[in-house]
C-alpha cells in the first residue's frame, strides 16, 4: 500500500518510468501519505515497548522509566498506545491449560472396579459362547458409564462457572483522565493510582508515594507489611527487598501511591509463579466427606450381602457365572456410588441459582454452612446503609447552625443558615465557608458522573462543597503530605500550602470529635481564632451527642499551622440512610432464628438510632462499646455478646474478638462488611460476606461470599438456599437408600429360600440407572421449600441420616420388598421356574415402586398436593422418561431379548400401578399424621427429625 503511494508520488513529480507520464501529487494525498507513515512509525515504536524486569525497573529514574515505556506520567497512555500494546502483550490475565480431553475423561470411568468386573463377566460370556449375555452386559456397562460421565462432566462445567467471580478492578490514568477499569485491561506503561484496600493489579514501579505500606505476605510469606518508596535503588538485590516495586496480587494496607505498570499477565512475577503451579484438586466439603464415609460403609455392607448371596447360590447348585454376573450387577446397583456426585451437583446448582440472584459463593462448603448460620454480624456503613453519604447538618465552632438539602453525589441542593433560611454560597459566611473548605481539602474523593471515586464520607463532603460552589478550592492548594485515616487513630490530615501566596504551611484535619479536639488549642469565631475553653469543648460535645442521636455520623474539622496548634472549625452531620429492604430482611432473618448484630465504629447515639431504624430489636437495644469488649474477661465475653445487638466504637481487633466470642458460645457466625477494617473479621467468621460494588479488594479476598449488587436482603435468599439444599440432599439419600436396601433384600431373600432370581443382571443395571440417574438427580434440584427457611438453624452436628429418616427409609424399603415379592410369588409357576412373564411383572413392579417412592421423597414434611406436581419440571421429565424407557424395555422386541421381558396387558400395568402406589399413599399418610398428630413444639425443637 505504501509502495503504491510512493510510486504515485514519483509519477506526479514527473519522473518517467516505463514510458508513462507522471502527474504532481495532490495536497490531501500528500498529507494522507505522511499520516500513514507516521502511524506506521508509531506502531513500530509501540512494538518496541516490552515488559521490564523488576530488578531493572527499580534502578530507573522516573524520567528514564517514562522514556522506556513511552508514557507521560501526568496524562498516561493514549487509547492508540493501549490498543497496540494489547496486541503485543495480550490481556493482563492468566489462562490455565488444564483441560483434559473429553475422551480421556470418558475412558477414566472404566477404571471403576465394579465396571471392570462387569466387563470381565461379559468376556467370560463370550468365551462360553453366551453372546446375547455378553452384548447385554456390554450395553449396560456403556449406559452406566455414560450416565456417570455426563454427571461428572456437568459438575465440572458448573464448577468452572463458579470461578468467574467478581473481576478485580483498578484506577488508571489514561489520556489525562483517571478511569476505573478492570485489571485485565492494563498494559505495560499504564499509570495506575493505588489507595488503601486496593489489590495491586500488575507489577508496578512506583513514581509517587504517600506513607505506602503493602501486605506482600501472599508473595513473600512475611506477615509484616512492607514500607514503599518512589526513589530509585542502587542495587538490585532480592525481589523481596525492592522497595519501589509493588507486585501483582499484593494488597495496599496503608497510604497511597502511583506508578507505571512494568509487567502484566504471565510477564509479572505472579505470572512466573503461575507458570510453575500445578493444578490442585478442589478439597471436598464436610458434607461430601460424610457422604463418602456413608458410601463406604454401605459399600462394605453391600459386598458382604452380595458375597453371601453368591456363596448360598453356588452351594445350592446354581450356575456360578450366572450368580457372579448377578452379584456384580447387584453391587453396581446397590452401592450408592452416585451419592458424592449428587451432593456435588446439588451444591453447585444451588450456588448457580444463588449467582442468578446476584450472590457469588466462592467456596462450595459455604453453601451447606449457610443452613447452620445462627448469628449475622454486620458492619453498618455501606452494608446496612445505602453508602450514599449525605451531609444534612452543619454546626460551626462559634455556634451557627445550617441545614443542607439534596441527597447523593450530584451536587444538587442548598446550604441554609438557621433560623433565617439564608442560602450560603462560597464564603458569604466565613465560619461555614472555612468549615466546608477544610472538608474539601482534607479529602481524596473525586465525584464523576454523580458517582464517588473514593470513600463515601469524603464524597459527602465534596458534594457539600459543590452545593456551596467551593469544590474547586482544593485546586488552590499544593498537597505536601498526607496522614491517612485508620481505624486506630480515627482521623486523617493533609499538609498543604497555597499556590498563589507565599505563606506558611497549613494542616487540615477531619475525624472523630474526641480525637480531633485533642489537637486543637483555638476555635474559629467568625474568622478570628480564639482560645478553646472548657465551655466551648462542652458545647461541641453536646452538639455531637445531639446530632448522633438523630442517626447522623458526626465529623469534626480543624485547621492550623501545626498538628498540636489547630483551630477547631466545627461539626458536620452526615446521614447514611438504611438500604432499601434492610429492615424487612432483618425481620425475616430474626423470624428464621438468625440473630442480627450491628458492629460499627460510630458513636453510641448514632449506632442506636440506626439500630432502631432497621428494627434490630423490638424491645430495648443492648449495646456494648469496643472498650468494654477489651475489658471483659474472655469467658464472660462469650456469655454477654449473645445478648448484645449493637457494638459501637469498634476497631478491627474488636470485631475479631466479638466473632471469636460468638463462635466460642457455639454460634455459627456470618459477617458482612465492605472495608479494609472488616477483612480480619470476614476471614475469621464461618461465613464472610463482602459487598461487590462498594467493597474493597481486601474485603472481597477475605470473604467466602460476595453480594454483587450490595443487596443485604440477598442474604435471606442465601440462607434459604443453604437450608433447602440440605433438605434436598436428605430427600435424595432417602430415595437412593430405600432402593438399594430393597434390591439387596429382594435378591437375598430369593437366594436364601432357594427361589429363582426375581431380577436378572440387565434388569438390576436398569434399576441402577433410575436410582443414580435423572429421577434421583432431579430430587437434588427440588425448588427450595419456603417452610425450610422458617426452621431454626440446624446444628453442624446434625447428620444426614437422622433417626426419623432411617425409619422412613426402612418403611419405604419394607413396602417395596413386600409388594415386589407378592408379585414374584403370584406370577411364579408351580414348578418354581423363572419365566419371562414372572421376571417382567416383578421387574416392572419394582420400577413402578421406585418411581412412586421418588414422588413421595420430594419432601419429608409436605404432601405432594402442597408442593405441587408441576413445580419441579426436571422431576416430571425424568419420571416420564423412565416410564417411557420401561415401556420400551417391555414392548420393543430387540430390548425384550436384552432384558428377557415379554409384553404385558393393560390390566397388568394398571394392577402394578395400583400396587406400587401403596408406597406413595402410606408415606403421604405418615406425613399427614406427623403434621396433625405430632406436637408443633417438638417439630420445631428437632427440625432434623422432620
From Swiss-Prot:
The modification Phosphoserine is found at residues 267-268. Highly expressed in the gastrointestinal and respiratory tracts, prostate, thyroid, salivary, and mammary glands. Expressed in colon epithelial cells (at protein level). Expressed in brain and testis (at protein level). It is found in: Golgi apparatus, trans-Golgi network membrane; Cell membrane; Basolateral cell membrane. This is Calcium-transporting ATPase type 2C member 2. GO terms for biological process: calcium ion transmembrane transport; intracellular calcium ion homeostasis; mammary gland epithelium development; manganese ion transport; positive regulation of calcium ion import; protein localization to plasma membrane. The keyword Transmembrane helix applies. Residues 1-106, 151-231, 315-331, 772-804, 856-874, 927-946 are cytoplasmic. The active site is at 379 (4-aspartylphosphate intermediate). It is a multi-pass membrane protein. InterPro entries: ATPase_P-typ_cation-transptr_C, ATPase_P-typ_cation-transptr_N, ATPase_P-typ_cyto_dom_N, ATPase_P-typ_P_site, ATPase_P-typ_TM_dom_sf, ATPase_P-typ_transduc_dom_A_sf, HAD-like_sf, HAD_sf. Residues 71-95 are annotated as: Interaction with ORAI1. GO terms for molecular function: ATP binding; ATP hydrolysis activity; metal ion binding; P-type calcium transporter activity; P-type manganese transporter activity. It comes from Homo sapiens.
Amino acid at each position: 500500500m505504501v509502495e503504491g503511494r510512493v510510486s504515485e508520488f514519483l509519477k506526479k513529480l514527473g519522473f518517467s518510468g516505463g514510458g508513462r507520464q507522471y502527474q504532481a501529487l495532490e495536497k490531501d494525498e500528500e498529507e494522507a501519505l505522511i499520516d500513514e507513515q507516521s502511524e506506521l512509525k508509531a506502531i513500530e515504536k509501540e512494538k518496541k515497548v516490552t515488559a521490564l524486569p523488576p530488578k531493572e525497573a527499580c534502578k530507573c529514574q522516573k524520567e528514564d522509566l517514562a522514556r522506556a515505556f513511552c508514557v507521560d506520567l501526568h496524562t498516561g497512555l493514549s487509547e492508540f498506545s493501549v490498543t497496540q500494546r494489547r496486541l503485543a502483550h495480550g490481556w493482563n490475565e492468566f489462562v490455565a491449560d488444564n483441560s483434559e480431553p473429553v475422551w480421556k475423561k470418558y475412558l477414566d470411568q472404566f477404571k471403576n472396579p465394579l465396571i471392570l468386573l462387569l466387563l470381565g463377566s461379559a468376556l467370560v460370556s463370550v468365551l462360553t459362547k453366551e453372546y446375547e449375555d455378553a452384548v447385554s452386559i456390554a450395553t449396560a456397562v456403556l449406559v452406566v458409564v455414560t450416565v456417570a460421565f455426563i454427571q461428572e462432566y456437568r459438575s465440572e462445567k458448573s464448577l468452572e462457572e463458579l470461578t468467574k467471580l467478581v473481576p478485580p478492578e483498578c484506577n488508571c490514568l489514561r489520556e489525562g483522565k483517571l478511569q476505573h477499569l478492570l485489571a485485565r485491561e492494563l498494559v505495560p506503561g499504564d499509570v495506575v493510582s493505588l489507595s488503601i484496600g486496593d489489590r495491586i493489579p500488575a507489577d508496578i514501579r512506583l513514581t509517587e508515594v504517600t506513607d505506602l505500606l503493602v501486605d506482600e505476605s501472599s508473595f513473600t510469606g512475611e506477615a509484616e507489611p512492607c514500607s514503599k518508596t518512589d526513589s530509585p535503588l542502587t542495587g538490585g538485590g532480592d525481589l523481596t527487598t525492592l522497595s519501589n516495586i509493588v507486585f501483582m496480587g499484593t494488597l495496599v494496607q496503608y497510604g497511597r501511591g502511583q506508578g507505571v505498570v512494568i509487567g502484566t499477565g504471565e510477564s509479572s512475577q505472579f505470572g512466573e509463579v503461575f507458570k510453575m503451579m500445578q493444578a490442585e484438586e478442589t478439597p471436598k466439603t464436610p458434607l461430601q466427606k460424610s457422604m463418602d464415609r456413608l458410601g463406604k460403609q454401605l459399600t462394605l455392607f453391600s459386598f458382604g450381602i452380595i458375597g453371601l448371596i453368591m456363596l448360598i447360590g453356588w452351594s445350592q447348585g446354581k450356575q456360578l457365572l450366572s450368580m457372579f454376573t448377578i452379584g456384580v450387577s447387584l453391587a453396581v446397583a446397590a452401592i450408592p456410588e452416585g451419592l458424592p456426585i449428587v451432593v456435588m451437583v446439588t451444591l453447585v446448582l444451588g450456588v448457580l441459582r444463588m449467582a442468578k440472584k446476584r450472590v457469588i459463593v466462592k467456596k462450595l462448603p459455604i453453601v451447606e454452612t449457610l443452613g447452620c448460620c445462627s448469628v449475622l454480624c454486620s458492619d453498618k456503613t455501606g452494608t446496612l446503609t445505602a453508602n450514599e453519604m449525605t451531609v444534612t447538618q452543619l454546626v460551626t465552632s462559634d455556634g451557627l447552625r445550617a441545614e443542607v438539602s439534596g441527597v447523593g453525589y450530584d451536587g444538587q441542593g442548598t446550604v441554609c443558615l438557621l433560623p433565617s433560611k439564608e442560602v450560603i454560597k462560597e464564603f458569604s459566611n466565613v465560619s461555614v465557608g472555612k468549615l466546608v473548605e477544610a472538608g474539601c481539602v482534607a479529602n481524596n474523593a473525586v465525584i464523576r458522573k454523580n458517582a464517588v471515586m473514593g470513600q463515601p464520607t469524603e464524597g459527602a463532603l465534596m458534594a457539600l462543597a459543590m452545593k456551596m460552589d467551593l469544590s474547586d478550592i482544593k485546586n488552590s492548594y499544593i498537597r505536601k503530605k498526607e496522614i491517612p485515616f485508620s481505624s486506630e487513630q480515627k482521623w486523617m490530615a493533609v499538609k498543604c500550602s497555597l499556590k498563589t501566596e507565599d505563606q506558611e504551611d497549613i494542616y487540615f484535619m477531619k475525624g472523630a470529635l474526641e480525637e480531633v479536639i485533642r489537637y486543637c488549642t483555638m476555635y474559629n469565631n467568625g474568622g478570628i481564632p480564639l482560645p478553646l475553653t472548657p465551655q466551648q469543648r462542652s458545647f461541641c460535645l453536646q452538639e455531637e451527642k445531639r446530632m448522633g442521636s438523630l442517626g447522623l455520623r458526626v465529623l469534626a474539622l480543624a485547621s492550623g499551622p501545626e498538628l498540636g496548634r489547630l483551630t477547631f472549625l466545627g461539626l458536620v452531620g452526615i446521614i447514611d440512610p438504611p438500604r432499601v429492604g434492610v429492615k424487612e430482611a432483618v425481620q425475616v432473618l430474626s423470624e428464621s432464628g438468625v440473630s442480627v448484630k450491628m458492629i460499627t465504629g460510630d458513636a453510641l447515639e448514632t449506632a442506636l438510632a440506626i439500630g432502631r431504624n432497621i428494627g434490630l430489636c423490638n424491645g430495648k437495644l443492648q449495646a456494648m462499646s469496643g472498650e468494654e469488649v477489651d475489658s471483659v474477661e474472655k469467658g464472660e465475653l462469650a456469655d454477654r455478646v449473645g445478648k448484645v445487638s449493637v457494638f459501637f466504637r469498634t476497631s478491627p481487633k474488636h470485631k475479631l474478638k466479638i466473632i471469636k466470642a460468638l463462635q466460642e458460645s457455639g454460634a455459627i457466625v456470618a459477617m458482612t462488611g465492605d472495608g479494609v477494617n472488616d477483612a480480619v473479621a470476614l476471614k475469621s467468621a464461618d461465613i464472610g460476606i463482602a459487598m461487590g460494588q462498594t467493597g474493597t479488594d481486601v474485603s472481597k479476598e477475605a470473604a467466602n461470599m460476595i453480594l454483587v449488587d450490595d443487596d443485604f436482603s440477598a442474604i435471606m435468599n442465601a440462607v434459604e438456599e443453604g437450608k433447602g439444599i440440605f433438605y434436598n440432599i436428605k430427600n435424595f439419600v432417602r430415595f437412593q437408600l430405600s432402593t438399594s436396601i430393597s434390591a439387596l433384600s429382594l435378591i437375598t431373600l430369593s437366594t436364601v429360600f432357594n427361589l429363582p432370581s426375581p431380577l436378572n443382571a440387565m434388569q438390576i443395571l436398569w434399576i441402577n440407572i433410575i436410582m443414580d440417574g435423572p429421577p434421583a438427580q432431579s430430587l437434588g434440584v427440588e425448588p427450595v421449600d419456603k417452610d425450610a427457611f422458617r426452621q431454626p438453624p440446624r446444628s453442624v452436628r446434625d447428620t444426614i441420616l437422622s433417626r426419623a429418616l432411617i425409619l422412613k427409609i426402612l418403611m419405604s424399603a419394607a413396602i417395596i420388598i413386600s409388594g415386589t415379592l407378592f408379585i414374584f410369588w403370584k406370577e411364579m409357576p408351580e414348578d418354581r421356574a423363572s419365566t419371562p412373564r414372572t421376571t417382567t411383572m416383578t421387574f416392572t413392579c419394582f420400577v413402578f415402586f421406585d418411581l412412586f417412592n421418588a414422588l413421595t421423597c420430594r419432601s419429608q414434611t409436605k404432601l405432594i398436593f402442597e408442593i405441587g406436581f408441576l413445580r419441579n419440571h426436571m422431576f416430571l421429565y425424568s419420571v416420564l422418561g423412565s416410564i417411557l424407557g420401561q415401556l420400551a424395555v417391555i414392548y420393543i422386541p430387540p430390548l425384550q431379548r436384552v432384558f428377557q421381558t415379554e409384553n404385558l396387558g393393560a390390566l397388568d400395568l394398571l394392577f402394578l400401578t395400583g400396587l406400587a402406589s401403596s408406597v406413595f399413599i402410606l408415606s403421604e399418610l405418615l406425613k399427614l399424621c406427623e403434621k396433625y398428630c405430632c406436637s408443633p413444639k417438638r417439630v420445631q425443637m428437632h427440625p432434623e427429625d422432620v
